[in-house]
Amino acid sequence: TKRVGSPEFGYIDIPSKWIKFFDAEVEGLIQYTDGSAYNIVTMNAVSKAEAEVADGETFNAETIAQHVAYNWSQKDNIEKMWGSKSTVSGIEAFQINIILKSGQLANTLVFQKDDKVYILSFEGDEETLDDFITNMKDTWSLDGKGAVSE
């Protein structure tokens, strides 16, 4: 495995063979793929200043998870979507589980540490997703010791 990430988004361990991925439609995120461009992990984080939180809304993981779920719900390629609770490195997380009409799976974990909400997403096939999500939940931290820069 190799450790990837940034001080802004945190760090996770991913398989050594995974490579940096650039999605032309999104900027400012960290993404890696197994080379297929089908299995992709995305790391992001937002501060209160960066989040588009409406008056009366609280800036926290639950609110950001609701925003993420709403954004997904606006897409026309969703077969099924549901939420659940989880943990990332011992921190309570909101998990958004998605099955796309193509059969591809998507899973987003939203959690808060200090004054930031972190968003870890995975899109891909079921076999890769199951292993990846478990590993991601166990290895995420703000500790970049041993991280590679690519």
Describe each model-derived feature in a short phrase.
Residues 12-15, 61-69, 108, 130-137:
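Extracytoplasmic/secreted envelope proteins and their assembly/folding machinery
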Residues 16-17, 82, 95, 138-139:
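Extracellular/lumenal ectodomain signal focusing on beta-strand-rich modules
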Residues 6, 55-60, 124, 128:
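A general boundary/transition motif marking the beginning of the first structured unit of a protein
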Residues 1-27:
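N-terminal "mature-domain start" segment
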Residues 21, 67-75, 135, 139, ...:
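Structured segments of extracytoplasmic/periplasmic soluble domains
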Residues 18, 116-150:
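Surface-exposed amphipathic alpha-helical segments
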